[in-house]
């Protein structure tokens, strides 16, 4: 998977996914290797942003500063789902660019991302504390997307 159509405007929130509950998943945390359940890291926050990314994905690298900006400007719970990546490459990516994520879960074979309805990387879901999808962003986040997310989470 790779986001195709980088020259197209960011597409978001297909009607079939809005207000749909994101499927629960379990995976290992990138740094600690601890097995975590998605519901347990979402339920205690009013909003959670789940960002599917890879170290080899150029658009992921390009949007990363926006995730760092979101972390600084909000108390948003940001979860990274590392897609089809090598652990050492993912850790190097985070060490070089900073870590906007409260947790980074691994998806080494891509099955979790596919089960969530992702078409490629990057993709981002804004969820409420019941894991319902408020927004889905296909492709790299834009400054406008970040403004929209900030407006939603501060409302």
PLM regions: where:
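A short beta-strand-turn-helix
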Residues: 25-48
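Conserved segment of the thioredoxin-like fold in thiol-based oxidoreductases
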Residues: 72, 77-109, 121
